[in-house]
Amino acid sequence: MAKQYETVIGLEVHVELATKTKIFCGCSTQFGGAPNTHTCPVCTGMPGSLPVLNRQVVEYAMGIGLATHCDITRVCKFDRKNYFYPDNPQNYQISQLYLPIARNGYVEIEVGDTKKKIRIHEMHLEEDAGKLIHDEWDDTSLVDYNRSGVPLVEIVSEPDMRSSEEVIAYLEKLRTTIQYLGASDCKLQEGSMRADVNLSVREMGTSEFGTRTEMKNLNSFKAIARAIEGERERQIELLEAGKEVVQETRRWDDNKESSHAMRSKEDAQDYRYFPEPDLVPIVISQEWIDRVKKRQPEFREEKLKRYKKEFDIPQYDAEILTESKHMADIFEETTALCGKPKKVSNWLMVETMRLLKEHNMESEDITFTSENLAKLIELADAGTINSSVAKEVFDHVFEENVDPEKYVEEHGLKTVNDEGALIEVLEKVIADNPQAVVDYKGGKEKALGALVGQTMKAMKGKANPGLVNQKLREMLK
């Protein structure tokens, strides 16, 4: 009988905090600037420069800790993690080992019908490293220090996950919670949320952990799921062949769907941690914790309950609309403006989702305003434009955030309700399509649809489809 194996997974999730300036200096954290333009002596590790802690970093981390049921450390401090690498100009990273900002929390996930708590071991603050660029010159790597000193919170889970489905559920719940707090945009493609997967396998029924590996270079949930399945299979193959799994860090190549060893996996003692001498401990009072707690927003679970009760929309729609705080804000703001929650939901669920998919965007990337969506819904409801024109206008609202009222006026897209002009067109359509007329009178209802289509085409989509249908039936009696 073949051996059965269990996968054991823990995650280290690095989240870039949404402060305007870096953790220990006043340099901008803006993404995408020209290389080495958001730097100063502090974040490039110049001798004699001294760090000054950004208070907002601490408050964001406290907010995340409270939202994930962690205990906030009342006196926490920073430590130096010593290592040499080109993207680390100080040759050490300021992090937290001995007294991290939060500990002992959990995130509750749901996979299928099963609920499970994933424990959080600790949450600590640290500074990000720079970025190595390997593809500019053939034989040289370049370093961009813009990212050096950007504030990170690292969320370390216990090894409580047993499948890629549980991992993705945990990451999605964590991302949604942090986005609702406004502490980070958590965009994997931009690196503001990064997950390292620590994975081992063991025979089913045993309690001892196997040898773990750490998987890096995972920049999407799909890549994370594929890396987990690939590493699980690799480790099982080694064990089945009587070989040992080496404790190491591996880099995942999503194009090849395989990984390769980067380096042996280090332990804490390899980094020679010692207390950071240039920063005093952070004393966190109960009053400070209470102030942060009081500012906590309405989270997704609370919104789901309220949406069903207040707006009477289907559970599935509510789940999609609340998945992103940005989408939830658009829904609520637009509904407040036009008073039509079900129609707002339909526009977001159908047309917005269609365009997000077409443009390979996430809901956080939406740039159109609630005011313009509300105007579009009002134009369609009033019959000023028909449904096909409304969809055409929405494409421009989505891409350019145009004012739909002005766009309709400037492009002459208002629905034609002039019966005299419509009857003239209908008479010509009937005369030009005798076979369709015969078919309709012979009982073929589809033939009427063809005549409606010809009429809409002749009037460049600006006719009222209901009125066209009504008049055609009257004229063909």
Predicted features along the sequence, with ranges:
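Basic, nucleic-acid-interacting segments
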Residues: 1-298, 315, 336-340
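Structural motif
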Residues: 3, 312, 335-344, 382-385, ...
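Amphipathic alpha-helical core segments of compact helical bundles
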Residues: 18, 202, 233, 328, ...
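Core structural elements
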Residues: 190-203, 308-330, 341-358, 371-373, ...
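Extended, non-catalytic structural segments that build the interaction scaffolds
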Residues: 288-295, 332-339, 373-385
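M16/insulysin-pitrilysin zinc metalloprotease superfamily fold
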Residues: 337-338, 344, 352-367, 375-380, ...
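Strongly charged, low-complexity linkers/loops
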Residues: 364-374, 378, 387-457
